Amino acid sequence: MEPEEERIRYSQRLRGTMRRRYEDDGISDDEIEGKRTFDLEEKLQTNKYNANFVTFMEGKDFNVEYIQRGGLRDPLIFKNSDGLGIKMPDPDFTVNDVKMCVGSRRMVDVMDVNTQKGIEMTMAQWTRYYETPEEEREKLYNVISLEFSHTRLENMVQWPSTVDFIDWVDNMWPRHLKESQTESTNAILEMQYPKVQKYCLISVRGCYTDFHVDFGGTSVWYHIHQGGKVFWLIPPTAHNLELYENWLLSGKQGDIFLGDRVSDCQRIELKQGYTFVIPSGWIHAVYTPTDTLVFGGNFLHSFNIPMQLKIYSIEDRTRVPNKFRYPFYYEMCWYVLERYVYCITNRSHLTKDFQKESLSMDMELNELESGNGDEEGVDREARRMNNKRSVLTSPVANGVNLDYDGLGKACRSLPSLKKTLSGDSSSDSTRGSHNGQVWDPQCSPKKDRQVHLTHFELEGLRCLVDKLESLPLHKKCVPTGIEDEDALIADVKILLEELASSDPKLALTGVPIVQWPKRDKLKFPTRPKVRVPTIPITKPHTMKPAPRLTPVRPAAASPIVSGARRRRVRCRKCKACVQGECGVCHYCRDMKKFGGPGRMKQSCVLRQCLAPRLPHSVTCSLCGEVDQNEETQDFEKKLMECCICNEIVHPGCLQMDGEGLLNEELPNCWECPKCYQEDSSDKAQKRKIEESDEEAVQAKVLRPLRSCEEPLTPPPHSPTSMLQLIHDPVSPRGMVTRSSPGAGPSDHHSASRDERFKRRQLLRLQATERTMVREKENNPSGKKELSEVEKAKIRGSYLTVTLQRPTKELHGTSIVPKLQAITASSANLRPNPRVLMQHCPARNPQHGDEEGLGGEEEEEEEEEEDDSAEEGGAARLNGRGSWAQDGDESWMQREVWMSVFRYLSRKELCECMRVCKTWYKWCCDKRLWTKIDLSRCKAIVPQALSGIIKRQPVSLDLSWTNISKKQLTWLVNRLPGLKDLLLAGCSWSAVSALSTSSCPLLRTLDLRWAVGIKDPQIRDLLTPPTDKPGQDNRSKLRNMTDFRLAGLDITDATLRLIIRHMPLLSRLDLSHCSHLTDQSSNLLTAVGSSTRYSLTELNMAGCNKLTDQTLFFLRRIANVTLIDLRGCKQITRKACEHFISDLSINSLYCLSDEKLIQKIS
């Protein structure tokens, strides 16, 4: 028994450690058994790791010239940050401060130190763990990849200034793409550039990270802000890298300390305040002796390209997933070649759009054509002094810098340049400068010197060209910014030939060759203005949706520039301002005084001011005077805010002809004359087009809403016509008065607008009051009811949705939804309870007409609900988006909608669940979710488990997921009706959850290719559970009809258990079970075995030990319909044909494929 246990232990350890090659990064903790076996404490105390690779330096000596001279090959340690140019937070900066800067909900990758497996936590969870006392921590976790660019923490941390000049991200990647990045996380779909420059590493005492090489061969800068670290360093020689790759592929990382296998290894301790630079390719392991906070970053550079490519190839061979690799690696390589060609030859291979955005080639220079040289020199010097990242440590110049003052002229000729270099252009494209000249990016280039590249750059660029040329077409990853990659490769080859004779001494300039043109002298076009909507001009006024934004033509030049918008304040007079909080809306529930977290910082929905006013502190932008009397009736002395240009002026101060448009809903708001008159012609033309289109749409929508007796054209003052006026999107929500002569409205129309405005205010108040009544059911009479006059105004016209039987022409029994308009006249004539009028059959609305209702009608329908409809039991949508139900109609409505929902896809059902609470419940009906497929999901989150429980599926597919035992146990305890469970590719640690008495009576169980399942595990599944003795002495899998065991390491012992505990089994999958023999077939078909009579389908494909004798045993199966023996090398086709001839006495069988025997029905 001991050799068998040893074999099991070795195979399990091998599988567990192979996961750490990142083939499946989402497995559960229980699955990994390859714990660390070497003594880490002994590795910390021994003296054999005494090699000397690290160089201690001063910050002032770390510059570009140092890297040009040595290529950044040795690890560097700086005991203090003087001269490095780094910036760090205050010494008392804590992990809680990190959480506040990046967000408490930010997801971070956390590594379990014991298993070297990654999990995810929120920053809030991690902070709680970090602040937990050491003795109370159950596990050791380590944060190693919190990238914090584009967060509040970004500006608190600055990397070494020298890194800024050699980092490919800053100098090679198109800068407009980096500037367009807005996402703070490392979501690859939202990433605009390789986001690897700033990392925060947080470790607790005792954390250990095994030997590794940073992704993509990147170099690393590493500053110990708090705590300390211990590093083991292995140089990246060819032999060591080969050992490292074999160590990764061996699956023995937990057993072998790589530092013991190499000839030289150095252990070095970093203390608080140290800055560490790890060059490309260095293999290192890290230990944390005390709780530590580290800031660092990764960067690629041009002085060790061969090593960077070599590490990327190792990642390919070890199959590291994309999540843990350098993003956009080959895209970056293409941009490196393009930048070198451009900076040396002034010839760009970028597309025109990229040239415009990153090189600013179509921009004019401010003082290119005019201005004297002295003024330019003074201005240039001032700008150079303001440049925080200017190189002051290297006085040697490299003649490759561009003539930034002449960039405009040079760039305008670029589109006509050839794709390849020519001999006559070498004098213009190769530039140099005398040694000892101070480097000035603003001065003109010196054309009497040739560019010199270091031998590191020449060798790296050659390797880069060879690598990109050798890639297959689907792996070249040519970015969209490169116009012609073949021409770029050709230009680089010619360039390398011309620069092959570069003088190594002249190349040590201390100045990087590749630099972006400075943008401080470039004129940028102003962005087009966007018309600011009238209603959302201030925050408190949020009762109505904002109109569609429309671009505005640039206004004429004006000496008055007042774009400062003012946040409006409450009027403190309207009903919304004087009432208290409701305590039930989502804003109130968020308030701290009602027990919420207080994140939204919004006022109650019922307290949103209906007419916010300008604050007292605003002044006229022309005269500078405040509004002395806000109650004044003199319009000329009132401060007015333009809803387009946001200018606040007294109308009397404007010395302009013509008048503007007044917003009657919002006080002190108008469209000033200069903004109104400018677009008057365009708006008039647009209004005519929209009115004509809207009339056609309304005619189509309202036609089926009329009853048979109504005329097609309603009277001018009928409720239907009022409905059209209310829904007219051409007129803004806030009606404005046209005060231009000859175009003013009549008194009747003004009264109509006033009446409609008052009615809309009443509708809002009524809707909010009814919401309060419904929320507080224990006090139904707590709110004052609306008067009969107000209800009469509301009943003028509104829409309801009811359910009706189809017309007589449609011979069916289903119930369909119907849209209906209730008019004031019909509402007054109907008794109470009210019966909704039926439409004539000829005018029954079709489905297309129902969909034609726009969002405006839907909003009015929600706002203009009527209490009497609820009393009558009519089914319709109320103001909260839920269904009013009464008696048996509730059940009827549910069944009607269920008949519709069952035709929807899963995605469409999820969309319907967002409509209202009632639809949410209906769409969770288990009849709609009989089968749920979560196969190959990267992570099974608790929300997904809760969703499964709500839907109570019959079939659940969790194949190839990282579900844990705890999660599966929680599921099976709450899914009593589960019949089909698919767990292919899962681990035994999860499948073992089925060995309990709470396991449902399954019909189908799929365990194909599950990890760690052998005969003992199958025994635990099939034997009666022992967790509740005396409850039931039968197997929980006794009702199984389909059992799939493909790819498992099982023997005849499993088959005996199947015969004993599965009397109803009809389909059995034993494919690719290598230990099965002819005797296995004999067991399945022996006299007295249940499978002899119950089996109908048997799959034994890929079982190489089966011979023709198996077919002799399989003849005993009584009701076989399919036998799959494909891939069984020792079974001949002739034997299969004889087998078919013997079976075809009673039924017909055929050999449909090679060794696939099927019954002909």
From Swiss-Prot:
Residues binding Fe cation, per UniProt: 212, 214, 284
Compositionally biased region (Acidic residues): 851-870
Q: Which residues bind Zn(2+)?
A: 620, 623, 642, 645, 650, 653, 672, 675
Q: Which cofactor does it need?
A: Fe(2+)
- Annotated binding of substrate, by residue: 209, 229
Domain of life assignment: Eukaryota
List residue spans for each LRR repeat: 960-981, 983-1009, 1047-1072, 1073-1102, 1103-1127, 1128-1155
One GO molecular function term of this record is: histone H3K36me/H3K36me2 demethylase activity
Q: Where is the composition biased (Basic and acidic residues)?
A: 746-757, 771-789
Q: Which residues carry this modification: Phosphothreonine?
A: 550, 632, 713
Q: Which stretches of the protein fold into CXXC-type zinc fingers, per the record?
A: 564-610
Q: Which protein is depicted?
A: Lysine-specific demethylase 2A
Species of the source:
Mus musculus
What does the organism's lineage look like at the top?
Answer: Eukaryota, Metazoa, Chordata, Craniata, Vertebrata
